[in-house]
Curated annotation (Swiss-Prot):
Induction of synthesis: By muristerone.
In-chain residues carrying the UniProt-annotated modification Phosphoserine: S101, S173
Keyword field contains DNA-binding: no
GO molecular function annotation: identical protein binding; metallopeptidase activity; protein domain specific binding; protein homodimerization activity; zinc ion binding
Purpose: Probable peripherally associated component of the endosomal sorting required for transport complex III (ESCRT-III) which is involved in multivesicular bodies (MVBs) formation and sorting of endosomal cargo proteins into MVBs. MVBs contain intraluminal vesicles (ILVs) that are generated by invagination and scission from the limiting membrane of the endosome and mostly are delivered to lysosomes enabling degradation of membrane proteins, such as stimulated growth factor receptors, lysosomal enzymes and lipids.
Associated pathology: Pontocerebellar hypoplasia 8: An autosomal recessive neurodevelopmental disorder characterized by severe psychomotor retardation, abnormal movements, hypotonia, spasticity, and variable visual defects. Brain MRI shows pontocerebellar hypoplasia, decreased cerebral white matter, and a thin corpus callosum.
Coiled coil: 5-47, 102-124
The protein's name in its UniProt record: Charged multivesicular body protein 1a
GO cellular component terms, A-Z: amphisome membrane; autophagosome membrane; condensed nuclear chromosome; cytosol; early endosome; endomembrane system; ESCRT III complex; extracellular exosome
Motif segment (MIT-interacting motif): 185-195
Length: 196
């Protein structure tokens, strides 16, 4: 069981590394978007933005898979812990029976304190497992993400691309910076929650 737990944790770490690499690749593509926008080449910027979004989604998918593997590892860890707690509770119960038979109140109190501590530890393990199983949020469509990323990079660098984006088909643009920041905030919160 311990070997399985080790393999699960190792796999989760590998998936997290893949997620970080995809995020790094996404940032590199975003830099290419900026360069293309500086050269007034919106078409190339769109291609690079699509690559950036694809890499970002790939990273989120790797992270999501790592989270699932980590959740399984938590379940295995809980099973191992529960086995140990059950064994300890059996010992405590025997000690409690022995203490009650002699009616030594100090021993009864000591055994009950140990029992309550083990129940609290069990609650903590259960809470950690439930927290690791929280659901993931749904991402918006890639086209909106592409336009949003182009707008964000253009705004951050003071570039004028609104007139060029307005020439695109209806509904292809106009996702604001607040939408991107909201998504990034959500991803940051999820990533922080996964690390804890």
């Amino acid at each position: 069981m311990d070997d399985t737990l080790f393999q699960l944790k190792f796999t989760a770490k590998q998936l997290e590394k893949l997620a970080k690499k995809a995020e790094k690749d996404s940032k590199a593509e975003q830099a290419k978007v900026k360069k293309a926008l500086l050269q007034k080449n919106v078409e190339c910027a769109r291609v690079y933005a699509e690559n950036a979004i694809r890499k970002k989604n790939e990273g989120v998918n790797w992270l999501r898979m790592a989270s699932r593997v980590d959740a399984v590892a938590s379940k295995v860890q809980t099973a191992v812990t529960m086995k140990g707690v059950t064994k300890n509770m059996a010992q405590v119960t025997k000690a409690l029976d022995k203490a009650l038979s002699t009616m030594d109140l100090q021993k009864v109190s000591s055994v009950m304190d140990r029992f309550e501590q083990q129940v609290q530890n069990l609650d903590v393990h259960t809470s950690v497992m439930e927290d690791s199983m929280s659901s993931a949020t749904t991402l918006t469509t890639p086209q909106e993400q592409v336009d949003s990323l182009i707008m964000q990079i253009a705004e951050e660098n003071g570039l004028e691309v609104l007139d060029q984006l307005s020439q695109l088909p209806e509904g292809a643009s106009a996702v604001g910076e607040s939408s991107v920041r909201s998504q990034e905030d959500q991803l940051s919160r999820r990533l922080a929650a996964l690390r804890n």
